[in-house]
Amino acid sequence: MEEKKYLKWYNKIGYGSGDVAGNVVYAFLTSFMMVYLTDSVGLAAGVVGTLIAVSKLFDGFTDIFFGSMIDKTHSKMGKAKPWMLYGYIGCAITLVCCFAVPVSLGTTAKYAWFFISYTLLNGVFYTANNIAYSALTSLITKNSKERVQMGSYRFIFAFSTSLLIQAITVGFVDKCGGDAAAWRTVAIIYAIIGLVVNTISALSVKELPEEELNEGEVKDDNEKYGMVQAFKLLVKNKYYMMICGTYILQQLYGAMIGAGIYYMTWVLKNKNLFGQFAWAVNIPLIIALIFTPTLVGKWKGMYKLNLRGYVLAVIGRALVVVAGYMGSVPLMMAFTALAALGQGPWQGDMNAVIASCSEYTYLTQGKRIDGTMYSCTSLGVKIGGGIGTAVVGWMLELSGYVGKNATQPQSALDMMQFMYLWLPLIFDVLIMFALSRMNVEDANKKLKAEKEIAADEVTDASDMN
């Protein structure tokens, strides 16, 4: 029987546009924050990396906290929309603060300014906004195909935004003066764009009534649970742990690709190549996302598509390594595009997989924790992206890199090559292995079949009586 449809085309586009706002923060932060702090503000990469790592200590708590708060929220707008809408106001303010370190401050005060701004952005406001935005996947439709389509629309907007930010920011900053004040100006413009688009996205969709989400069952007050119980429900779900780990690996991968600004500047001697490689990454991703819903239907599920895609991604990244040592930029771009094409399907249906993961908890534990379940998206983004950026700082510091120097030692150049060529390949291999174990769709089908058999047996027994 065909599933009920809940969304119009404009709902899907409206929802998807929300990741323009998310990537105005995330792509800008991960691609350019470190180079801004080291080369324009003059801070040490190793110290910045350590501060980012310390900041991540707060994230595990705040992700579960905000996920639990979303599950407990009951408002006219729904569970997630208020958090998505109001959380972004803080995102916009703190994003500007991260790129507006006052030059008049002493060195210690500059580090403190950055740490406070970065922690508030990632640990509080981005968490509230991003978990709520992701949770809408399971709160505005129960249709599995629509959930896949939402993921595709979302990440088409995400990668388009990431592409534009990576492609134009270096030139944009140069046109604004190329100094620390120029970075602040660009951050203000990006923050305003994000705030407007996030508001439009939040208002373009409507959450379903809780009775419909719970298949006609109305929760009573005895079914409420706290953050500790929600955490226990999460760790009992092996698929949640796999998705969380995969998300972290993806963001580590992204941080290394973002560190390509150093590789292009010092190894390839042309910082403008960073924007060209952004096209090689994001255009194939967008193409793959367009076809993901069709391929999911053709292969009757997401598992095979995701796994086969990442086999292709591993092959592509291995060939990037070969091309890098050959010194061929055109081949590096071609194989980068091949890898991105393979990564696309997982990006497109990831939110639908998380919705299936949430369904798995409902089938095994009898409780819905949609908001808390989507904490893996924010947790993975922040821990993976944050630790990835921190690792970049540590590795640069270890290699002897000094941002304001006219030349860099060979040890720094070798480290940049390792970060940009080898680490993305290693992370892709680990993701491929995780995806090979992540067949939550089949697990849910088996559980539903078992419940139907049990229900039939109860019906037969009562008929006999």
Region spans (language model):
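Membrane-embedded alpha-helical bundles of multi-pass transporters/translocases
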Residues: E2-N465
